[in-house]
């Protein structure tokens, strides 16, 4: 007899990104332009702090929210970016994924709704649904991946609890402009909803004038939750370290969820995390910038339309001209050209694919050549 499980999870599917990578792994020599993982090693000065911590036996329970010295460092790091949060308003988390999980666990009641502008990382919907709430999708493609205020207002209901925004965006690489940020602020203030900012790519920006929501709208501090990560700027994806910041009354509730989800982040990584905050990620950013230009030129030569990314390390070209679903396109590309991309429907937007350029220059060159040859046959 099969006993019942959580019915909220019945509609959830395993990550489409991981599924594509698993399929690519079955094809020897396949070039994977799919995962959003930097191809650089973690800087040595960061890794050395873990060795030192282990040598001195730093393997015991730390404070749930992270050591005070690290939270002080995170507070100062954010202050330097124009974001005023005290050390007591910061929690070190097991990656940005856990930060998002704890945030929504603390925030949502059954039947609440969260607005998710699409395309968006599929994790948002999964966490919302797992917490017995409803994801409401706002299609941003008609606005060139910006947020149209009228369209946003049409998504708001009495059940709306929050909106989650990601800028620079995964999968488009686009950043929200001032008009989009202001639209979110007006609607959030008038509707009385939270703004959850997934800012994990904020150090990977290629244009001037980039503003984060909390920088532009500090007056909504009490309604804003900021999610950050060590993974992307410092190539620390396997470390599973992130943090979140929010006003004291909000952080107090999120801290409860964090405590019972994971207890704490890893003790012997905390000094390394503090050290990472002092490391300038610009050298990696400049490599991504060069790759970005290479990718955009290659996509243009292939005749693929794309909204130029201003940050992160993704492009999201349209494949509508080929009359294939994004899933069929990507499976066909793996089987026929040995190159892996991510279907746009994994992000809630059909007719596009995500191409990641955080791979070696050699793999990027070969992957683009294979993709070009592939689309020429369609």
Where are these regions (language model features)?
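Conserved helicase/translocase P-loop NTPase motor core
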Residues: 70-71, 100
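PLP-dependent class I/II
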Residues: 2-5, 10-11, 23-26, 31, ...
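Glycine-rich loop-to-alpha-helix module at the N-terminal edge of alpha/beta enzyme cores
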Residues: 57-59, 73-81
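Intrinsically disordered, tyrosine-centered linear signaling motifs in cytosolic regions
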Residues: 60-61, 201
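Short beta-strand to alpha-helix junction loop
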Residues: 65-66
């Amino acid at each position: 007899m099969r006993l019942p499980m959580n019915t909220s999870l019945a509609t959830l599917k395993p990550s489409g990104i991981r599924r594509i990578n698993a399929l690519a792994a079955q094809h020897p020599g396949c070039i994977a332009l799919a995962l959003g993982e930097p191809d650089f090693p973690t800087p040595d000065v960061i890794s050395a702090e873990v060795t030192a911590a282990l040598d001195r036996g730093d393997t015991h329970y730390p404070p749930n929210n992270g050591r005070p010295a690290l939270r002080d460092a995170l507070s100062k790091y954010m202050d330097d970016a124009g974001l005023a949060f005290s050390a007591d308003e910061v929690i070190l988390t097991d990656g940005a994924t856990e930060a998002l999980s704890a945030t929504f666990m603390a925030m949502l009641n059954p039947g609440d709704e969260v607005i998710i502008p699409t395309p968006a990382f599929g994790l948002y919907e999964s966490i919302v649904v797992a917490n017995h709430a409803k994801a409401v999708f706002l299609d941003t493609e008609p606005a060139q991946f910006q947020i149209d205020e009228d369209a946003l207002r049409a998504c708001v209901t009495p059940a709306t609890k929050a909106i989650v925004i990601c800028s620079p965006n995964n999968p488009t690489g686009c950043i929200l402009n001032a008009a989009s940020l202001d639209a979110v602020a007006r609607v959030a203030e008038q509707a009385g909803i939270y703004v959850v900012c997934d800012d994990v790519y904020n150090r990977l920006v290629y244009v001037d004038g980039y503003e984060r929501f909390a920088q532009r709208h500090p007056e909504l501090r009490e309604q804003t939750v900021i999610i950050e990560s060590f993974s992307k700027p410092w190539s620390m994806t396997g470390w599973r370290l992130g943090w979140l910041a929010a006003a004291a009354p909000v952080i107090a509730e999120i801290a409860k969820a964090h405590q019972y989800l994971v207890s704490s982040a890893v003790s012997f990584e905390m000094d390394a995390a503090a050290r990472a905050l002092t490391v300038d990620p610009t050298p990696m950013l400049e490599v991504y910038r060069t790759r970005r230009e290479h990718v955009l030129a290659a996509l243009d030569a292939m005749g693929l339309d794309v909204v130029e990314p201003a940050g992160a390390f993704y492009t999201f070209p349209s494949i509508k001209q080929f009359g294939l679903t994004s899933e069929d396109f990507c499976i066909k590309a793996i089987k026929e050209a040995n190159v892996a991309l991510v279907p746009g429907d994994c992000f809630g937007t059909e007719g596009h694919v995500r191409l990641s350029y955080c791979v070696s220059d050699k793999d990027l060159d070969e992957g683009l050549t294979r993709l070009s040859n592939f689309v020429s046959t369609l």
